[in-house]
Amino acid sequence: MDQIKGKLVVSCQALENEPLHSSFIMGRMAVAAMQGGAAGIRANSVADIKEIKSQVDLPVIGIIKRRYEEADAFITSTMTEVDELMEAQPEIIAVDATFSKRVGGETLDEFYNKIREKYPNQLLMADCSTVEEMVYADKLGFDYVAPTLVGYTKQSKGLKIEDDDFAIIRETLAQITHPMIAEGNIDTPEKARRVIELGVHSVVVGSIITRPQLITKKFVDTIQNGGKHNE
């Protein structure tokens, strides 16, 4: 995956409750990202990935977001989602590698070993929320680790990826052997540049590029609140 090294990956996602929810639209969004210089795409769902791959010749990080009533993990968190994604053949499959509760009480070790046994050649990315989770995923053998879920899990509540000059990223990089793909609320070009300087393999940026309703809200909130926008 040298194609994305030191470069930008754009996350093109729109969930069912969002105005741009459409595989066609995500395909065009990927074209726009490519024209802007993106070196890769992150996408959610088999349909979106297939459409994106028909429109751009860029490596894809594929996921399936699916909520289970009994679990907290939700990004490609069972073999069902992995099997579905293999139909679309993304270059990398990202899975929930947090310590959050999983379906049926399955452990991350068990899940990881199942994937490796069935699809030994598939590149895997660990979406994590803490330094400890990323270090653990690295030791398990994930090809890439990522701080994607910082602030989105019970164990990372209140944490922000940019705190103390990206301390979470710096602390993790000092302890891992596999490359890190930085992702999660990296919402300015300056932040993206900084994490590359710190030594990450690549950086993923999503909402600030591809979710116009959220971009608009930032402008509206700042106008109405005298320089501050609501998170």
Q: Where do the PLM segments sit?
A:
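Active-site-adjacent beta->alpha loops and helix N-cap segments on the catalytic face
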Residues: 20-23, 42-61, 73-79, 97-115, ...
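A short alpha-helix capping/helix-coil boundary motif
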Residues: 6-10, 27-29, 60-62, 90-92, ...
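C-terminal alpha-helical cap/extension of soluble enzyme domains
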Residues: 6-20, 162-231
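Conserved N-terminal beta1-alpha1 strand-loop-helix module at the mouth
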Residues: 1-87, 118, 124, 132-144, ...
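Short, surface-exposed, polar/charged, turn-prone segments marking secondary-structure boundaries
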Residues: 36-40, 69-72, 88-91, 120-123, ...
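Short, structured secondary-structure boundary patches
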Residues: 60-67, 81-85, 115-119, 146-149, ...
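A cross-family glycoside hydrolase active-site/sugar-binding cleft signature
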Residues: 11-13, 44, 61-63, 96, ...
